[in-house]
């Protein structure tokens, strides 16, 4: 794992193609792109067939249009998402804001985990519909249907690896933040700084005051 925030080098460095293509998430994304491309290409290419008695096209998976739509949809979205995150990986080290890096890594983690689940559902769905398909309904496109099922199965693991790598990057960023965080709470064992003692000055009588005469020695005026 590279040093820096969230598994990437510190911002400001130049783009290094060799280091970029050697990153585990980049290699896994390229594999995921190829797998997704094969899946939706097989469905778009030979996933819809027609019988001799009709010109209407049907999905090769037990004539279930939802199966073809689901497989092609997750394949196309997986391909586009992989391309997007490849661009993010290329410019990730140029992002200086740690908060932006965190949100990108979290987005990668959530999307990869979701697509791992969707590929699992797609594999089970396509396998179930293919098992229920009548042999007479599949004159062509059988190999493409099997290929779509096979590479859907492989996509489960590739996206699972991407989710695991994203989690490791997120955890590395959180750990780095905790290590560099300084608690502003003062140490209770540290004595408080004593305030400077107030200097006692000699009291001075304020001006413009009259001394109060005491009644001691008072004599009344003479009476005539």
Curated annotation (Swiss-Prot):
Database matches in Pfam families = MARVEL
Which family does the record claim for this protein? Belongs to the synaptogyrin family.
Keywords attached to this Swiss-Prot or TrEMBL record, sorted alphabetically, are:
Acetylation, Cytoplasmic vesicle, Membrane, Phosphoprotein, Synapse, Transmembrane, Transmembrane helix
Query: What is the documented function of this protein?
Result: May play a role in regulated exocytosis. In neuronal cells, modulates the localization of synaptophysin/SYP into synaptic-like microvesicles and may therefore play a role in the formation and/or the maturation of this vesicles. May also play a role in GLUT4 storage and transport to the plasma membrane.
Q: What is its main location?
A: membrane
* GO (cellular component) term, any one: membrane
Q: Does the keyword Nucleus apply?
A: no
- Entry's Gene Ontology BP terms: protein targeting; regulated exocytosis; synaptic vesicle membrane organization
Instruction: Give the gene that encodes this protein.
Output: Syngr2
Per the record, residues carrying Phosphoserine are 3
Domain MARVEL, first and last residues per copy? 20-171
Residues annotated as carrying N-acetylmethionine in the record are 1
Q: Where are the transmembrane segments?
A: 30-50, 73-93, 105-125, 147-167
Membrane topology value: Multi-pass membrane protein
Protein known as: Synaptogyrin-2
Does the record carry Nucleotide-binding as a key word?
Answer: no
User: Lineage in the entry?
Assistant: Eukaryota, Metazoa, Chordata, Craniata, Vertebrata
Q: Which InterPro entries match?
A: Marvel (IPR008253), Synaptogyrin (IPR016579)
